[in-house]
């Protein structure tokens, strides 16, 4: 009975620690506004703290953070082929679609060099 009670207390303590630890690792707290009657030195210190706070929140994140959303969960990305419209790309406005597998005027193929689709005019079948 005492072993069960000890295990339950350890489980409760572990759960509380697990719930409280992420709060300590979260975003920094916003600096407290010193008030309208603050001295110029206090306002300068507040401005510096606010600048650090904003820089911390808006800094670019590289590596693992770039692969996760705001909650720390992995971001599931669909491939371009699974996106609406498939992997087909159309030429930008004003550029004709290339024919024969080469780009315009014999240059290497571009991403929009493709097989005909609904967006391009197809020969009518009579």
UniProtKB/Swiss-Prot annotation:
GO terms for biological process: feeding behavior; neuropeptide signaling pathway. The keyword Signal applies. Residues 77-126 are annotated as: Disordered. Keywords: Amidation, Hormone, Secreted, Signal. Residues 1-26 form the signal peptide. InterPro entries: Pancreatic_hormone-like, Pancreatic_hormone-like_CS. It is found in: Secreted. One of its GO terms (molecular function) is neuropeptide hormone activity. The keyword tRNA processing does not apply. Belongs to the NPY family. No icosapeptide-like peptide is cleaved from the C-terminal. The lineage of its organism: Eukaryota, Metazoa, Chordata, Craniata, Vertebrata. This is Pancreatic polypeptide prohormone. It comes from the Eukaryota. It holds the Pfam family Hormone_3. CDD domains: PAH. GO terms for cellular component: extracellular space. PANTHER family: NEUROPEPTIDE Y/PANCREATIC HORMONE/PEPTIDE YY (PTHR10533), PANCREATIC POLYPEPTIDE PROHORMONE (PTHR10533:SF2). The modification Tyrosine amide is found at residue 62.
């Amino acid at each position: 009975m005492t072993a069960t009670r000890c295990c339950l207390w350890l489980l409760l303590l572990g759960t509380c620690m697990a719930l409280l630890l992420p709060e300590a690792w979260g975003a920094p707290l916003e600096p407290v506004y010193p008030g309208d009657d603050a001295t110029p030195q206090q306002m300068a210190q507040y401005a510096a703290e606010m600048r650090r706070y904003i820089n911390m929140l808006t800094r670019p994140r590289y590596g693992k953070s770039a692969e996760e959303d705001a909650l720390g969960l992995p971001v599931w990305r669909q491939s371009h082929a699974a996106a609406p419209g498939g992997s087909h790309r159309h030429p930008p406005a004003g550029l004709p679609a290339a024919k024969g597998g080469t780009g315009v005027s014999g240059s290497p193929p571009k991403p929009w060099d493709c097989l005909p689709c609904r967006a391009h005019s197809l020969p009518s079948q009579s």
